Structures are given as C-alpha cells and as structure tokens.
A protein has these predicted regions:
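Compositionally biased terminal segments of proteins
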Residues: 1-209
Length: 209
C-alpha cells in the first residue's frame, strides 16, 4: 500500500532535515493519509488493512487507529466528511506529495516541506492550547525550521491560499510575547542562539523580504 498513502505527522519529521541535529522527538504512532471520497471507500481500506494483519485499536478510543506488530498506526482520510475530522491542508498536501527514498528499493510518499509545516501549524492552532512549550506540533515546526537549510526559500516560493495561511500563522506567532521562549525550549543547548535566527527568518518571511 506504500504507493497509495502519504506518510504524515511527527514520525516523518526527521526526513525533512539536512543538518546534523539532536534527537528527534519520540512518537508513539505512525500517521498515514489516504485519499477517499466516501465512507464506503474507507470501509474497503479497513478490510484491506485487516487482511494484512492490522487490528483495530478499540481501547484507544481513536476510530482511525490500528496496531500491527506492536506499532500504532493512524489511518486518516483526506476528507473530513468520512470520520468527521481532518486537516484543511491534507487534500492539497496529498496531491503534491513527494517521493522519499528509504532504501534503494523502498520509496514512500511524504508531504512536501511547505505542506508539512502547514499541517503542523493548522494542528497547533487547533489543539496547541496556545502554548508552544508543551505542543508536540510546535516542537516539530521548530525542528524543521532549525534543521532544514532550504525551508525559508521553499516557503517563500509558495503561492495563493497556502502562502496566505503561512504568513498569517507566522505573523500570529511573532505577535506572541512568548515566542522566543517557545522556540528556545525545543532547541538543544548548543543551538540556543538559533532562536534569534529562526525569529529573524520568520519576520523576513512575513514582511516579504
């Protein structure tokens, strides 16, 4: 099924980095995204998953959660009409997903960097409780901003609603008086000075420089 799904979420964050960095935040589950138009299609995917050994994790209370060989896997549709929830950037992110080579003969699809950040910003806005210090979504955002050298050029190249959303989200962050602390708490000791670099790049981005 690897070619039919896009891997998303915190489990993929290390795939976006190109500089030496500290440990990545441990994550308890793997999130995969599937493009579906109806619940009937989701039911068919469920049957396919069960045939491959996936078991519904009813105890978790999460309707899209499965387990296989002890690994927790959340299987999420792009549309919010199927399970009642979704991220607004899932559909365009799925459409523009990129290939990532894990091994020579194994390739998976992941979000492009700009859509990864958009989904994380959207998730933080919805469930971050307005505190970047304790948000795993915000931690992932900082990790990519700190460890991907081309990220700001990639963000500047975005257009339309995506660009507007990114600019608006970063503007809101810059207007928060705790932004320096929020970023600092997710940086390694040796990287503490980079909080100023990240904030500076954020400001240049929203100002269109």
């Amino acid at each position: 099924m690897a070619g039919q799904v896009v891997y998303v979420g915190g489990a993929t964050v290390s795939l976006y980095t190109d500089r030496l960095s500290g440990e990545v935040r441990p994550t308890d589950d793997v999130d995969i995204l599937i493009e579906l138009l109806s619940y009937k299609g989701y039911a068919a995917i469920e049957e396919k998953l069960r045939s491959k050994g996936f078991v519904n994790d009813w105890e978790s209370g999460v309707i899209c959660r499965y387990k296989i060989h002890g690994v927790v896997v959340d299987v999420m549709p792009t549309s919010d009409q199927i399970l009642g929830f979704a991220n607004r950037w899932y559909t365009p992110g799925f459409a523009s997903a990129i290939d990532y080579v894990i091994e020579e003969d194994y390739i998976v699809k992941i979000f492009s960097p700009e859509y990864f950040l958009a989904t994380k910003l959207e998730a933080f806005n919805n469930r971050g409780k307005r505190d970047g210090r304790t948000s795993t979504d915000f931690e992932d955002i900082v990790y990519v901003l700190n460890n991907r050298s081309a990220i700001w050029d990639e963000l500047k190249a975005t257009r339309g609603p995506l660009k507007d959303f990114l600019v608006g989200s970063f503007t809101n962050l810059l207007n928060n008086k705790y932004i320096d602390e929020w970023i600092s708490v997710h940086l390694e000791y040796a990287d503490q000075e980079r909080q100023y670099f990240i904030v500076g790049c954020m400001r240049e981005f929203v100002e269109g420089k």
